Regions:
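Conserved N-terminal catalytic/coupling substructures associated with nucleotide/phosphate chemistry
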Residues: 1-167
């Protein structure tokens, strides 16, 4: 049986004691470390997600304001998440010793590697390239009462993208 003292200690423990690694500021990073094409795509996606904010308003924000609204800067500093999502290739080295890379690997029936490719920042642009490499078979099912099969992908693209973003 648990004592009242032990119960009190457990209940007073912080729920999220660990720091968010991706939210930490990269000390020597600047806006110049970010890819302009990646920022443009992020801005376009932001306008889709936040459609209640007029597009003209979002377009009028300077890069620093936009990154702040996205939560990719903290107190004006560029976060690790900003480098991972929007950074130029050479900016990834500012995150060392972390290796900012996803490796796609194709294996044969004996699990021998027959092909591979490395992908790196900016992941907002490369995630679609990675997705295109993943074998996602089209499944066909014959429902009753029809001559035409229903088709669906083996894996939902949204789910795969979510897993890639969480990498």
């Amino acid at each position: 049986e648990m004592t009242q003292e032990r119960m009190a200690v457990i209940l007073e423990e912080p729920i999220y004691a660990a720091k968010d690694w991706s939210a930490e500021i990269v000390p020597d990073a600047t806006i110049d470390d970010l890819d302009e094409v990646a920022i443009a795509k992020a801005r376009m996606m932001f306008k889709k997600v936040h459609s209640r904010i007029p597009a003209e308003e979002v377009n009028a924000w300077n890069v620093q304001t936009f990154l702040s609204k996205c939560g990719l800067t903290r107190n004006g500093g560029i976060t690790r998440a900003a480098i991972i999502l929007l950074g130029k290739y050479e900016s990834a080295f500012k995150l060392r010793p972390a290796v900012v890379q996803v490796t796609w690997t194709r294996r044969d029936k004996n699990q021998e590697v027959v092909d591979y490719e490395h992908f790196t920042v900016p992941f907002i642009l490369t995630v679609d390239e990675i997705l295109s490499k993943i074998e996602n078979l089209t499944l066909r099912e014959m429902p009753g009462g029809t001559l035409f099969p229903d088709t669906m992908k083996q894996y939902d693209d949204y789910t795969i993208r979510e897993a890639l973003h969480n990498c």
